[in-house]
UniProtKB/Swiss-Prot annotation:
Protein name per its UniProtKB record: Cyclic pyranopterin monophosphate synthase
Pathway field: Cofactor biosynthesis; molybdopterin biosynthesis
Enzyme category, top tier: lyase
InterPro entries associated with the record: MoaC, MoaC_bact/euk, MoaC_sf, MoCo_biosynth_MoaA/MoaC, Mopterin_CF_biosynth-C_dom
Catalytic activity as recorded in UniProt: (8S)-3',8-cyclo-7,8-dihydroguanosine 5'-triphosphate = cyclic pyranopterin phosphate + diphosphate
GO biological process terms, semicolon-separated: Mo-molybdopterin cofactor biosynthetic process
CDD domains reported for this sequence: MoaC_PE
Binding site for substrate: 75-77, 115-116
Lineage: Bacteria, Bacillati, Bacillota, Bacilli, Bacillales
EC numbers for this chain: 4.6.1.17
Disulfide bonds: none
GO molecular function, one term: cyclic pyranopterin monophosphate synthase activity
Family per similarity comment: Belongs to the MoaC family.
Pfam families, sorted: MoaC
Length: 168
């Protein structure tokens, strides 16, 4: 297991120095989901939620969140993102509908974008909840997880089983 790098010799928090790391293309994909009742799914699909187009607003919120990750996660470096793309797909299970969210983030820099992808997917889910809570307070967010990442000295990572096919 790698040793923790966010602590100094005194055991205090520090931001890792990445000034000597080589810039390279780095990508990350993260997934989250929101489980809701079927009526809310239909309202979202038909754009009948009073606060507006839920998926459009969630998409913009997710992009904004990726760009602001370093402002809310203490040890994240500010990163010049080169792209953020968010996709949605629906799954019907028993009496529920599940909105799956995938955020794909890309940069060319000295550190990865996993936290930006995770933050983006999470904020998309939170935005859906916020916009639909009047119609269904029983919505459930999650799971949220890193699907894959490329680039960097630690190499690529791909989750073995994703349970979600975002091609739907």
């Amino acid at each position: 297991m790698n040793e923790f790098t966010h602590f100094n010799e005194q055991g205090r928090a520090k931001m890792v120095d990445i000034s000597e790391k080589e810039a390279s293309v780095r990508t990350a994909a993260a997934v989250s989901s929101v489980s809701m009742n079927r009526e809310v799914h239909e309202k979202i699909k038909n754009r009948e939620i009073g606060k507006g187009d839920v998926l459009a607003v969630a998409q913009v919120a997710g992009i904004m969140a990726a760009k602001q990750t370093s402002a809310i996660i203490p040890m994240c470096h500010p990163i010049a993102l080169k792209g953020v793309d968010i996709a949605f797909c629906w799954e019907k299970k028993e009496q529920k509908s599940i909105l799956h969210i995938q955020s794909n983030v890309k940069t060319k820099g000295s550190t990865g974008v996993e936290m930006e992808a995770l933050t983006s997917a999470s904020v998309c889910a939170l935005t859906v909840y916020d916009m639909c809570k009047a119609a269904d307070k029983g919505m459930v967010i999650g799971p949220t997880f890193l699907l894959e990442k490329t680039g960097g000295k630690n190499g690529d990572y791909k989750r073995e089983k994703a349970d979600v096919d975002m091609e739907d």
